[in-house]
Amino acid sequence: MTKWKRANPNGTRDYLFEECTLIEEVEQKLRRTFLERGYEEIRTPTIEFYDVFAFQSRPIDEEKMYKFFDEKGRIIVLRPDMTIPLARVIGTQRCDTPLKVTYSGNVFRANESLTGKYNEIVQSGIEIIGIDNVRAEIECVISVIQSLQKLKVQSFTIEIGQVQLYKCIVKKLSIHEEEEKVLRTYIESKNYAALSNFIRDKKLDRCDETVKLLEKLPRLFGNLEVIEEAEKLASSNEMKMAITRVKEIYEAIDKLGYGSYISIDLGMIQHLDYYTGVIFKGYIYEIGEEIVSGGRYDELIGNFGEMLPAVGLAVQVNQIVKALQEQQKPYERKRIDIMIHYELNRLAEAERLRNLLQKDGKKVALSLFSNLNDTFQFARKNQIVTVVEAKNESLVEYVWKEKWVVQKEGETSCVTFKLR
């Protein structure tokens, strides 16, 4: 029964000290940027009813959810996604729209073993609800680019795709559901040979404009030249409108001076089926995992109430932290500047002194040791160079200079302070 008590479950890990601080800083900087741009915060429970994720289109595989029972025998899951719970809130609370919201929290998804993916990750994101025009997508992309800039993330790119274009092709060629799943993997992985064989085996007419577009889809990535090529092969107004939307977003972001951060990939297809239009994925050259994902989902909120258009982007905090650790100097944990050693009957004065020194910009901690020599040893081990002893009616300040020497007695060198 104790076989696994010293181990973590597959796909999880512990975060210690400096890394915890860095995760917290990334979350807070993202949150601050989003709030400054007018987003309002929403929090949803870590656990949700299974039914929240089990509507008809099944956007998340059942096998990827962590499931258990509540006290009444109902199936509960650890949330595998942040957007669907937010859709539940918007659909059931009848919030006034348009609405810009931001969130941050852990999501849990059971990935296959040995994939290198974590089953618990931190996501911070934004959603714009109630707006179906291109301004919503533009606002989302600007918000994320600016947040990544403030985090000093280097060499990132946000790719813009269009799942509606792919859906139009599938519909026009009458490709069945099971075949579509196979086709999707070929396009996403840019497996040109397998895609060509698929077209041959399905006996699709290679002279047909839609088939030509399908075969070229995995190759349609880059800048605006990609759009021009796709427009030539678009065989319906719906396809042309889908392509035009990507073009409008790209041009708007480029005019703002952010063109170096974006690219187009019309062969990108999100694995979550609730997306209905423009989709996004962000990458950093140094790491293989995506750091940003999202898109337009105009039909999702209707599963919980009124049908409302919406678009959103999620930032993968863990991947941002990994990138920052690789791109920048190792994160240095802020050391304690001063440690206060105190007699137990002087606790109140010691705490008052700690608060005063902290207001002066110092990082100050109370010693946990009753013996002054133990405090000295701990201070040396943790590179703390100043110890203040609060005893009887006075203060004694010690500074390390190859040994502990009295710097001042009666008050500290930082602030004037007398015990009373």
UniProtKB/Swiss-Prot annotation:
Sections of the chain in a coiled coil: none
Cysteines paired by S-S bonds: none
Pfam families: tRNA-synt_His (PF13393)
Keywords: Amino-acid biosynthesis, Cytoplasm, Histidine biosynthesis
NCBIfam families cross-referenced by the UniProt entry: hisZ_biosyn_reg, PRK12292.1-6
Family under the similarity heading: Belongs to the class-II aminoacyl-tRNA synthetase family. HisZ subfamily.
Protein name, as recorded: ATP phosphoribosyltransferase regulatory subunit
UniProt source species: Bacillus cereus (strain AH187)
Gene name linked to the record: hisZ
